[in-house]
Amino acid sequence: MSVPTLSNKPETVDLLVLAPGEKKVTCTISDKGDCNIFVIKLEDHTIGNLIKIQLCQDPKVLFAAYRQPHPLQNAIEITIKPKGYAGVKLLSDNVNNILSQVATLKENFAKKIQKYKESNSYYEDY
């Protein structure tokens, strides 16, 4: 007996690699003209939620949300309603802020591991 397959399941390579000439991020303006809608390909809820939380903490942003349009599509949409600022700049600044926070976290984590190894003789063999 054969194993049933999902006919609408995308190819694995389409979930991991952008097609030639395809852009990672695209930006459109909402129908009302007050929001920027960014589509980020090859990303999921992990980065979407992180960016949304960072944007919601920014005083230059009135509204921020994200959604994954379809579970079989490996893309997210981030909607930003800025307070008179350029949405592209807001997204860029907030992503750079996230990268800075991650770098700080990584540095602090490495320091704590080193301090733990120095105080614990069990790890001297490694």
Swiss-Prot record:
One of its GO terms (biological process) is transcription by RNA polymerase II. GO terms for molecular function: DNA binding; DNA-directed RNA polymerase activity; protein dimerization activity. It is found in: Nucleus. It holds the Pfam family RNA_pol_L_2. Keywords: DNA-directed RNA polymerase, Nucleus, Transcription. GO terms for cellular component: RNA polymerase II, core complex; RNA polymerase II, holoenzyme. Its main location: nucleus. Belongs to the archaeal Rpo11/eukaryotic RPB11/RPC19 RNA polymerase subunit family. HAMAP family: RNApol_arch_Rpo11. PANTHER family: DNA-DIRECTED RNA POLYMERASE I,II,III, DNA-DIRECTED RNA POLYMERASE II SUBUNIT RPB11. DNA-dependent RNA polymerase catalyzes the transcription of DNA into RNA using the four ribonucleoside triphosphates as substrates. Component of RNA polymerase II which synthesizes mRNA precursors and many functional non-coding RNAs. Pol II is the central component of the basal RNA polymerase II transcription machinery. It is composed of mobile elements that move relative to each other. RPB11 is part of the core element with the central large cleft. This is Probable DNA-directed RNA polymerase II subunit RPB11. It comes from Plasmodium falciparum (isolate 3D7).
